[in-house]
C-alpha cells in the first residue's frame, strides 16, 4: 500500500471539509481516521495529521463560514460567502497546490520508511459498519447539504449567516427531539459568554479611541503606501495569531481597518479585510497553540502514543505558513494593485 496518495487525499479532504465545517470537527474526525489507518498500514500518523491540521486552517480561510475570524470580519463589514470565496478562496486554492507539493516532499522519506511492512487486508474494517443508524445518517446529510446551499446563496436570498446558522441548528434539534436535553447540555455556553464579553470590550476600545490610535500609528508607519499597509496588517495578524487566539485579534482589528480605509487615500476596505483574514487564519497554523485545531490534532496523536513537541511541529508548519503568506502577497499585489 502506498501511503503518499493517502496523504494527498487527506490533505485535500481536510481543506475542502473545513470550507464548510468547523476545523476542530474536521481534525477530530480525520486525525482519528489517520491514527486507525496508521495502525493498519504500519506508518507514523504524525506527518499526515500535521499536514491535515495545516490544510484545515488553510481551507477554513477560503470561505466566510470556514473560520471564526472570517465570520467576524464578514458579518461586521457586510461581505458575503461569494466575496470570500472569490478572494480569500482564490488565495487558498493556489496556496493549497503549493502546500500539497511542500508536504509531499517534506514527509515523503518519513512516510515511505515502512513501505515493505506486510499488511493483512482481512484486518481492515468494513466502512458500512461505521453507520450505526442509516436514517439519522441520511437526515444529517440532507441538513448539511441544505446548510451549504443556503450559505453559498445567502447574498441572493437576503438571509444572514447568523440566521442560517440558527435555523439549521433548530432543524437539527427538531430531528433529534429525543436527545434535545442532552444536546442542549453539551452546548458550549462558556464560548457564547466569551463572545458577548469580547464584543463589549472591542466596542469599548472603539468608543474610547484606542483603536483609532492604532490605525493612526499604522498609517504613519506606512507613509501612505497602501500595499505596505496591506502587508503590515497581514504579517502582524499572522505573527500575533501564532501565539494568541485569532478570534479576539480579528474582532479588535476590524474597527482598525475600517478607520484606515476611511482616512487613507486609495485604501480599499475589502483588500484590508482579506489581508486580515488570511493573516489571522494562516498565522495560527505556525505553532501548536496558534489555533484550536492544532491543539486538538496534536492531542489526538499524542494519546495514540505519538507526542508532538514544538520542534517537530514548527519544523514544517513555519515554512508552510511563510509559503502561504508569500503566495498571498503575490496574489494581492497582482490582483489589487
Predicted segments with their positions:
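Hydrophobic alpha-helical transmembrane segments
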Residues: 4-12, 26, 49-50, 85, ...
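Hydrophobic alpha-helical transmembrane segments in multi-pass integral membrane proteins
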Residues: 63-68, 146-152, 198-217, 283, ...
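Small-residue-rich segments of transmembrane alpha-helices in multi-pass membrane proteins
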Residues: 4-11, 52-63, 121-128, 191-205, ...
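Membrane-interfacial helix-loop connectors
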Residues: 17-53, 68, 72-87, 188, ...
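Helix-loop-helix module between adjacent transmembrane segments
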Residues: 1-5, 10-23, 55-63, 91-99, ...
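Hydrophobic transmembrane alpha-helices of multi-pass solute/ion transporters
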Residues: 159-227
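Juxtamembrane and boundary regions of transmembrane helices in multi-pass small-molecule transporters
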Residues: 40-46, 50, 62-63, 82-132, ...
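Long, contiguous bundles of hydrophobic transmembrane helices that form the permeation core
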Residues: 96-179
Amino acid at each position: 500500500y502506498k501511503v503518499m496518495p493517502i496523504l494527498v487525499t487527506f490533505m485535500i479532504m481536510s481543506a475542502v471539509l473545513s470550507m464548510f465545517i468547523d476545523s476542530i470537527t474536521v481534525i477530530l474526525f480525520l486525525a482519528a481516521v489517520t491514527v486507525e489507518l496508521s495502525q493498519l498500514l504500519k506508518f507514523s500518523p504524525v506527518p499526515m495529521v500535521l499536514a491535515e491540521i495545516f490544510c484545515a486552517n488553510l481551507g477554513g480561510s477560503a470561505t466566510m463560514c470556514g473560520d471564526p475570524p472570517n465570520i467576524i470580519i464578514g458579518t461586521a463589514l457586510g461581505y458575503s460567502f461569494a466575496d470570500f470565496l472569490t478572494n480569500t478562496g482564490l488565495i487558498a486554492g493556489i496556496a493549497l497546490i503549493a502546500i500539497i507539493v511542500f508536504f509531499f516532499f517534506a514527509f515523503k522519506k518519513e512516510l515511505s520508511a515502512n513501505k515493505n511492512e506486510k499488511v493483512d487486508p482481512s484486518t481492515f474494517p468494513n466502512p458500512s459498519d461505521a453507520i450505526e443508524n442509516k436514517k439519522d445518517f441520511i437526515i444529517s446529510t440532507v441538513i448539511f447539504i441544505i446548510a451549504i446551499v443556503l450559505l453559498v446563496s445567502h447574498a441572493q436570498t437576503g438571509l444572514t449567516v447568523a440566521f442560517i446558522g440558527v435555523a439549521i441548528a433548530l432543524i437539527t434539534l427538531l430531528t433529534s427531539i429525543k436527545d434535545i436535553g442532552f444536546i442542549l447540555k453539551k452546548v458550549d455556553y462558556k464560548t457564547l459568554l466569551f463572545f458577548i464579553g469580547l464584543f463589549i470590550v472591542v466596542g469599548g476600545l472603539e468608543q474610547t479611541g484606542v483603536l483609532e490610535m492604532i490605525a493612526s500609528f499604522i498609517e504613519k508607519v506606512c507613509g501612505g503606501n497602501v500595499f505596505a499597509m496591506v502587508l503590515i496588517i497581514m504579517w502582524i495578524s499572522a505573527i500575533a495569531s501564532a501565539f494568541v487566539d485569532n478570534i479576539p485579534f480579528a474582532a479588535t482589528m476590524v474597527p482598525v481597518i475600517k478607520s484606515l480605509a476611511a482616512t487613507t487615500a486609495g485604501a480599499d476596505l475589502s483588500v484590508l479585510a482579506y489581508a486580515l483574514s488570511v493573516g489571522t487564519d494562516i498565522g495560527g497554523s505556525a505553532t501548536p497553540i496558534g489555533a484550536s485545531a492544532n491543539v486538538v490534532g496534536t492531542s489526538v496523536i499524542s494519546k495514540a502514543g505519538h507526542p508532538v513537541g514544538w520542534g517537530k511541529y514548527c519544523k514544517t508548519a513555519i515554512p508552510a505558513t511563510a509559503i502561504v503568506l508569500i503566495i498571498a502577497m503575490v496574489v494581492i499585489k497582482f490582483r489589487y494593485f
